[in-house]
Structures are given as structure tokens and as C-alpha cells.
Amino acid sequence: MNIYDKVHELANELKECEEVKNFKKYKKAVEAKESSKKMVEDFRKVQLQAYSEQMEKGAASQETMEKLENIGKIISMDLDVSNYMQAEVKFGVLWEDIIKILGKAVDDDFVDHK
């Protein structure tokens, strides 16, 4: 068994995986429409702001949480953005699982045991 052959096999499987296909498809759809692209960027900014506040103060401000909620409502009305966000989460779970499996194969210290 050649390890590189197996890695290429995994790469080919990933290309055909529904999570990857959907993520790429919806990302392309969002990037093709400026308003959708801006919506995702705005959401990311507020999401980062909420995370920063949570790290600094223990919780995000009421104002930031309201912004997140409002952007979430707007996102749910844009099918491309909504599909993209869902596909991104599913891909993220898949990717995290793959990294955990590979980490365990090499050394248990690579895996975060939260």
C-alpha cells in the first residue's frame, strides 16, 4: 500500500462527496450575486464581533445578538445564501471528522478532546 495512492483516493472521494459538491455549488452561486456575497460578508463581520465580545466579556452584547438575529432572518429569505450557509456547516463537520480521524492515526495529541 502506497500512502500517496490512498491520499489521492481520498481526494477523489472528496470531489464526489455530496457535502463538497453542494458547498462548491452554493458558494459559486453566492459569489455570482453581489447582494448575496455582501450578505455573507456582513454576517461574518457580526459573527466575529459576537465571538470577540464573548471572549472579552463572557457574552455578546444584546445589540450584537439582535444584529445576528436580524441578519439571520434576512439570510433565510435568500435561498442561495441559506443553502450556502447550511452546506458550509455540513462540509465543516465532514472536514473536522476527517482531521480527527487522521490525527488519531498519527498521534492522539493532534486531536482536541473537547
Curated annotation (Swiss-Prot):
Source organism phylogeny: Bacteria, Bacillati, Bacillota, Clostridia, Eubacteriales
Family indicated by similarity: Belongs to the UPF0342 family.
Provenance organism: Clostridium novyi (strain NT)
Domain of life: Bacteria
HAMAP family per the UniProt record, alphabetical: UPF0342
Protein name: UPF0342 protein NT01CX_2274
